[in-house]
Amino acid sequence: MGGGVVHLVSAKNTRRLEGPDMIVLHYTAGTSAESSALFLTRPDVSASAHVVIGREGEVFQLVPFNIEAWHAGKSWYAGRGGLNRYSIGIELDNLGKLRFSGGLFIAECGRVVPPEEVYTDCSGDRPMYWHRYTARQVRVLREICTLLEETYPIRDVVGHSAITPRKIDPGPALEFAFSEFQDRN
C-alpha cells in the first residue's frame, strides 16, 4: 500500500465486530488526513473509523478491523440496522461538497479548492461541486477493499449516504472508485 501504515490508538473502541461483512466509505471534510485521524482518536469525540486514507495515499489505522468503530451512526441497510456492529469504516481525506462563490470553490471549513481539484456533478437540475479524490487515494482504497474482501466475508461496499439518509458522503466524486465492488455483490 505504499509507505506503510501509521497506527494510532482509539482506546474508546473495545467492542468486537459481529462480522464484518460490509465496508462503509466516508469523507473527512477535514483539513488533513492526520488531523482527522487525531481528531477521531480523541476520547471526547463520539466518532471513529478503522482507517483514514490521505490524499497522497498515506494510511492511518485507528481501530483494529475486528473491533467496532463508531462511523455509521444511526444507520440501516438491506434490512439491518446498527451497522457499526457489522461494518468497517474507511474515511478518505476530502473536503466534500463545495460552494461556488465569487469565482471560488469553497469548502465548508473555509478552505479554497483549486479548480483542477473540483468535480462537477451535473446529474441534478443545477451543477453541484465536490472535492475530487486523488488517484493515489483511489488506488489505496481499492487495495484496502480488496485485502478486506480476501480476509472477511464482505458483501457490500457502500457510501455513508446509502446507510444514513441525512449524510451525503462520500459524494458522487467517488462513485467510480467503489462501483466495481458494488457490481460484484
Question: What does each of the following model-derived ranges do?
Answer:
Residues Y152-K167:
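Acidic/histidine-rich, metal-coordinating catalytic segments
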Residues P165-N185:
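Short, low-complexity, polybasic intrinsically disordered segments
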Residues G2-R155:
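Active-site-adjacent loop/helix surface patches within enzyme catalytic domains
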